[in-house]
Design a protein with these regions (language model features):
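Active-site-adjacent C-terminal substructures of enzyme catalytic domains
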Residues: 158-159, 167-189
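Metal-coordinating catalytic core of metallo-dependent amide/deamination hydrolases
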Residues: 25-44, 48-49, 56-170
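Glycine-rich, phosphate-binding/catalytic loops in enzymes
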Residues: 3-4, 147-148, 177
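Metal-associated gating/positioning segment near the N- to mid-region
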Residues: 1-42
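Short loop/turn motifs at secondary-structure junctions
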Residues: 54, 127, 178-182
Length: 189
């Protein structure tokens, strides 16, 4: 997404880039077109590089699949990396990163997919340590975030959250109430 970096330097907002087809949905489209094997090899190269630089532990998040198959693909790659390399690797399920285009008019249906399809399979295959949600206007509301976090906790995942990147809508409080390990972004207080 190099062009998006240039767009940010030139003054476009994250929301303007997303509205032009960039951002998370752009990455999701590319990820879903990539095979699990190719994704593993791409990720392996990056992992080798950070290990050579002295990194002792990494967290790798999903969140760019936004489909059952795409999210599971990412998490399976992370699990395979963790089993093949001596570095500590923690996996975070971030299926609630954005709403896929298919669900733009039925957001609750996507939340049902996360809770009833993704989370059970993630738990069954032991694919993640944490659950993360992007709680922000235009993404996941406070109520939706709370519902997803609660479901993740039921499956043994420790919560993390992305909040207050553009607006303060109450996400920090949900993180505190649910003992989130971290609340990230915090660009707007």
């Amino acid at each position: 997404r190099e062009q998006e970096f240039v767009d940010r330097i030139n003054g476009l907002t994250y929301e303007e880039i997303a509205n032009r087809g960039g951002g998370i949905l752009n990455s999701a489209q590319k990820l879903n077109a990539t095979s699990e094997e190719e994704l593993y090899h791409q990720s392996e190269e990056r992992l080798k590089e950070v290990i050579q630089l002295g990194t002792g532990a990494v967290e790798i998040k999903s969140g760019y699949g936004l489909t059952v198959e795409g999210e599971l693909k990412m998490l399976r790659v992370i699990k395979k990396l963790a089993s093949n390399y001596p570095i500590a690797i923690k996996a975070t399920f971030l299926g609630a990163h954005a709403f896929p285009s298919l669900f733009k008019d039925n957001k609750e249906a996507y939340i049902d997919v996360i809770i009833n399809e993704m989370l059970p399979e993630i738990a069954k295959e032991n694919l993640a340590d944490f659950i993360d949600v992007f709680c922000e206007n235009g993404y996941f509301t406070v109520a939706q975030t709370e519902k997803i976090i609660a479901a993740g906790i039921q499956y043994g995942l420790q919560p993390k959250m992305h909040v207050n990147q553009f607006n303060s809508i109450g996400g920090i409080q949900i993180g505190v109430q649910n003992k989130a390990l971290s609340v990230d972004h915090l660009e707007v207080m």
